């Protein structure tokens, strides 16, 4: 009751809570697919690597809506975008559970991606504009909460109800309720003054740097490559952990679901902890330390001395990589210079979509060609590459010039 009174007295508190809940909801579908995929492909009679089609369709929708987000935010408003996008995502996820053919499910993936991309871009832009850097860290931690709960919801549906559809119906229904919440608060979203945080640095969007000038800088492409590889590895392990453990290593499905959930659970804890120590530790130590930890965890997953080693491996990888994405994003201006940072950030977000689609899909192709045991080898190669590329960016001209 006291919380509701405070929300009515301070509307911004209500918007913050709604934004946090929305990011929990944004993470839920990402956590469902990895655990649910073996049952989905069995139901539709699909090969192992057919997952790439669904990933590609959803990422295509995601990239389209994020690319258009600035145009839409200026003309439609964030409240309407969030209400429509949550509703669209909810309907698409519910549609997964009713379509009779795999091709229709893939088509619905486009609409799921469109909604998710608009939610992601809309809330990131809104929180950065109105609430500053601190709340942005907690916002992304909420995504980790969602992607941690996703495997647990799907595991319950598979073990207790013997269906993958339960998970998507729960999450789809939640998205529809969230869409209604945004629709009921449209006025509040438009009333909050668009003032930047008091402690914000000079805005990167103040620079009117031509895109062509940005594209000519090697440091920019190295920075974009970092995001492509990092997000691909993050999504690759999240997508294939359950299949690796159940189909290649004979782990009990319920236990494997717990292992998959532990990856995102430790990922979330790592991101929360990193937000506390980031100012003292610094961006470079967070990235380098995270990559070293990821290599150790991947080595343990590759070694595979026993079931407990599997859960320890995915947990170590999760907590290690957690701070890398926000640290890389924060360090963009240092790597490429202030004048090129705004354009580079947009390119980096595009690279995350491409990486999330391409790398897990490629892992699936290799797993089908050889075996699922190729997944840890792929991760090892990616993390070694990330460490080499990031070290190179520290020595390049973009690391020292803030033009």
Regions found by a protein language model. Name each.
Residues 33-34, 217-261, 265-268:
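Extracytoplasmic gate region of multi-pass secondary transporters
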Residues 40-41, 72-73, 153-162, 245-246, ...:
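Interfacial helix-cap and linker-helix signal at transmembrane-aqueous boundaries
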Residues 45, 77, 98-103, 250, ...:
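Helix-breaking motifs and short loop linkers at transmembrane-helix boundaries and internal kinks
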Residues 64-103:
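Conserved MFS/SLC helix-loop-helix module at the cytosolic interface between two early adjacent transmembrane helices
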Residues 65-78, 270-282, 367-368:
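Helix-to-loop junctions at the C-terminal end of transmembrane segments
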Residues 108-143:
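Cytoplasmic helix-loop-helix junction between adjacent transmembrane helices
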Residues 139-190:
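Helix-loop-helix hairpin linking two adjacent transmembrane segments in secondary transporters
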Residues 338-372, 379:
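A late C-terminal transmembrane helix in Major Facilitator Superfamily
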């Amino acid at each position: 009751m006291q919380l509701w009174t405070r929300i009515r007295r301070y509307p911004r508190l209500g918007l913050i809570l709604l934004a946090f809940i929305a990011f929990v909801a944004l993470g839920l579908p990402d956590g469902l697919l990895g655990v649910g995929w073996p049952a989905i492909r069995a139901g539709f009679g699909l090969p192992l690597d057919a997952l790439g089609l669904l990933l590609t369709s959803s990422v295509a929708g995601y990239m389209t809506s994020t690319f258009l987000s600035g145009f839409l935010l200026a003309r439609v408003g964030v409240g309407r975008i969030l209400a429509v996008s949550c509703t669209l995502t909810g309907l698409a996820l519910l549609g997964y559970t009713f379509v009779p053919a795999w091709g229709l499910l893939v088509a619905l993936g486009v609409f799921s991606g469109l909604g998710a991309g608009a939610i992601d871009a809309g809330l990131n832009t809104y929180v950065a504009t109105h609430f500053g850097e601190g709340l942005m860290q907690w916002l992304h931690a909420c995504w980790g909460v969602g992607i941690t709960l996703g495997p647990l919801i799907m595991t319950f549906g598979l073990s207790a109800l013997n269906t993958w559809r339960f998970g998507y119906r729960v999450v789809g229904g939640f998205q529809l309720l969230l869409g209604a919440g945004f629709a009921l608060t449209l006025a509040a979203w438009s009333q909050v003054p668009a003032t930047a945080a008091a402690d914000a640095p000079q805005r990167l969007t103040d620079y009117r740097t031509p895109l062509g000038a940005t594209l000519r800088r090697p440091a920019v492409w190295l920075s974009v490559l970092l995001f492509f590889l990092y997000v691909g590895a993050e999504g690759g392990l999240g997508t294939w952990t359950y299949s690796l453990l159940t189909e290649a290593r004979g782990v009990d499905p319920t236990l494997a679901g717990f292992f998959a959930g532990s990856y995102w659970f430790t990922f979330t804890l790592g991101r929360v902890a990193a937000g506390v120590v980031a100012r003292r530790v610094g961006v470079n130590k967070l990235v380098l330390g995270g990559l070293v930890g990821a290599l150790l965890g991947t080595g343990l997953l590759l070694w595979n001395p026993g079931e407990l080693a599997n859960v320890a491996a995915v947990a170590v990888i999760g907590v290690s990589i957690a701070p890398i994405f926000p640290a890389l994003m924060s360090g963009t201006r240092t790597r490429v210079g202030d004048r090129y940072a705004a354009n580079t950030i947009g390119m980096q977000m595009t690279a995350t979509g491409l990486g999330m689609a391409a790398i897990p899909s490629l892992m699936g192709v290799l797993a089908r060609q050889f075996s699922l045991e190729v997944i840890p080898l792929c991760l090892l190669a990616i993390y070694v590459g990330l460490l080499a590329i990031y070290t190179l960016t520290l020595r390049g001209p973009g690391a020292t010039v803030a033009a």
